[in-house]
Amino acid sequence: HIGALIMLMALSVSVGGVIERSGLMEAVPESFGSVFVAATILFVILVFVGMIMDPFGAVILVSATIAPIAYKNGIDPVHFWMIVLTSFELGYLSPPVALNQLLTRQVVGEKEMDEADAEVRHLSFYYKYERWILPLLVMVPSLLLVVYVPLFFYAK
């Protein structure tokens, strides 16, 4: 199983290289009409990056390409990196890769996960998919708070 995680990390680093070399990040304008629009677009991009890349490659990609755009649009550096961390965590909890779900499965073990799946197989939709839904129900409002509340205090 650890080989699958290493393969996943290698693939995500290569995806980061493809994104960087393709010029996709240059398509994002350097200036937006409002800091709120900039924050919204940036956190959507960051969640997407968190969904498909490992943490190390994602931080390198963001610090080289997205961070300067955020700074030029008036987002404070500390606030920006808090948005990055929270967005990445939401991405790591979300499909298609769900890296944190995979790592948790590795730590807990296949036997325990199969037992837990067997216990909830006959229950409602929520109980079947609780380990996917509950983190998303917590992280989405948390991300919205982290992104927008500080902007009300320092945005121009």
Task: Describe the predicted segments one by one.
Residues 1-156:
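Alpha-helical transmembrane segments of multi-pass membrane transport proteins
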